[in-house]
């Protein structure tokens, strides 16, 4: 199986240098963002077609930051590859000994079809770190449910294009093992600190995982939820379904991230308070994660603690 290698990526990226500059010359420096042990980033695609100019811009920046990219052949194709081909390319890249980290080219839609067919026994043989987002909520939570790899949710490459300096610094801290505290708003408090491991992502995809029975066991976990305006009208339906299925029954806490941001703030606040009243665990809001420039990486294998006043602290170290 052949991939687009480092040299081809550099050449292709230089063709789009003008696009990168026009899009904003003062983009955050990405040097060291993925930690000292990441030299080669594998870039797979299991969902929608990639916006090429945006992809080449971020590729250019990553190469300038010192990373080597291995890009799956379907990333720059103009049509979505077959499910079987997307599956095979992902599995091959996962098992490639040169690849230190997988960061998907984009989210979009279509990941569910690939996730359903993955050879999990094969993937268990390599503890690959994977960063997925949005539609890839389907993959990273399925990894957690299957006990495969090291799942994280955070910006895919086309999302990283518009991540701001604060976001990049926060992601760099996480990937280097020194994430800083984040102060959250308390929607429904607790008498003592809550602690656990994270799970979560885009509400629509968490809802789909629930319906399919693929959602990881949330017992003792802290569930992070974002919701884009595209799905705002279905918020009650999706949360209601997850409530009915008992998703939140034994969770340690729920953290609301970017949520219906273009809806009236008072209406969103009321909706979250109504939701919090229906579940037994504490609920917090205001974590910077979602389809926003000021986003974060959430590491599903890193323990975190939330104090009664809403201070979220991650465990330190690699």
Predicted regions and their residues:
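Bacterial N-terminal signal peptides
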Residues: 8-18
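ATP/NTP phosphate-donor binding region
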Residues: 23-98
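Short internal beta-strands
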Residues: 71-73, 132, 251-258, 284-286
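Short Gly/Thr/Asp-enriched flexible loops that form oxyanion-binding sites at enzyme active sites
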Residues: 107-125, 141, 269
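Short, acidic/small-residue loops that bind anionic groups at enzyme active sites
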Residues: 120-142, 150-157, 282
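Conserved anion/nucleotide-ligand pocket segment
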Residues: 149-211
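Internal helical hairpin/lid segments
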Residues: 214-268
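ATP/nucleoside-binding phosphotransfer catalytic cores, i.e., glycine-rich phosphate-binding loops
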Residues: 258-318
């Amino acid at each position: 199986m052949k991939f687009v290698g480092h040299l081809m990526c550099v050449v292709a990226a230089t063709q789009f240098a003008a696009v990168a500059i026009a899009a904003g010359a003062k983009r955050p420096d990405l040097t060291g963002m993925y930690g000292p042990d990441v030299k080669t980033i594998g870039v797979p695609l299991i969902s929608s077609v990639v916006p090429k100019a945006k992809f080449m811009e971020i590729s250019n920046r990553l190469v300038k930051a010192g990373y080597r990219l291995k890009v799956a052949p379907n990333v720059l194709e103009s049509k979505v590859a077959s499910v079987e081909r997307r599956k095979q390319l992902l599995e091959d890249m996962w098992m490639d000994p040169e690849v230190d980290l997988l960061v998907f080219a984009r989210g979009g839609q279509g990941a569910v079809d690939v996730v359903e067919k993955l050879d999990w026994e094969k993937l268990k043989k390599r503890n690959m770190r994977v960063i997925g987002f949005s539609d890839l909520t389907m993959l990273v939570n399925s990894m957690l449910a299957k006990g495969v790899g090291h799942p994280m949710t955070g910006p895919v490459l086309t999302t990283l294009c518009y991540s701001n300096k604060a976001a990049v610094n926060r992601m760099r801290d996480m990937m280097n093992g020194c994430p800083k505290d984040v102060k959250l708003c308390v929607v429904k408090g607790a008498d003592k600190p809550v602690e656990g491991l994270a799970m979560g992502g885009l509400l629509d995809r968490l809802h789909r995982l629930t319906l399919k029975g693929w959602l990881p066991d949330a017992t003792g976990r802290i569930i992070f939820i974002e919701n884009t305006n595209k799905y705002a009208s279905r918020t009650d339906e999706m949360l209601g379904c997850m409530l009915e299925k008992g998703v939140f029954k034994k969770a340690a806490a729920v953290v609301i991230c970017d949520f219906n941001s273009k809806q009236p703030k008072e209406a969103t606040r009321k909706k979250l308070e109504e939701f919090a009243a229906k579940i037994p665990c504490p609920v917090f809001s205001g974590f910077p994660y979602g389809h926003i420039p000021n986003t974060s990486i959430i590491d599903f294998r890193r323990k975190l603690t939330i104090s009664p006043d809403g201070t979220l602290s991650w465990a330190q170290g690699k």
